[in-house]
Amino acid sequence: MKTALAAAALCATVSGAAAETMLHLSETATVTVAPDRLVAVVRAEAAADSAASAQDQVNGLIREAVALAKAASGIAVATEQYNVWRLEPKNGAPSQWRASQSILLHGQDGPTLLQLAGALQQHGLAVESLGWELAPETARSARTEAENRALKALRGRADGIADAVGLQFDGYRSLTVGSAPPGAFRARTLAAASLAAQSEPSAEAEDVRVDATVEADNGLKPR
């Protein structure tokens, strides 16, 4: 675990007739977690003399891709943005239309998803991006662990500083806990040549950092 000190301040405040010593501290803790969910974005694209023809081709590719994905155990699939646009003609050539749509695939069984991505490539789709991330439940657990570590470190520092100045901890006067989102979708964009790939893609997992920061005004009192 890595921790980092953000700020520390000791001051005396007056509440009624009694003076109270306030200690402001901030502490950050980091946990490192192995990602456990593979995410891929796969795109179908086609060009034709008419918008309808281009869309028909894309629709067929997407239907086939979704069917293959649903047949793969443990893989979730969702269709994404659909685009149709006209290509400006050049040198007197007839105009063309292009259509595209992407699908999002994710699952915790990496080999199965990679095999599926390879099969979709063979059916004429392109793998746009591929990467590992934390599943939601894993991210929540890591965030809780980071927060608990930061809180423990902050309380330990508060006790240590209080003892050094002849006082003792007397509770939090304010407490803020914040967590940065874990390293999102560590994707890599693949070249257009992936359309014609003869083997399934690969994706190496890299550990993800999850940070949590706590900030508190700590009341101190005489021993």
Regions found by a protein language model. Give the residues of each.
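Short, charge-dense linear interaction motifs
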Residues: 2-3, 8, 15-223
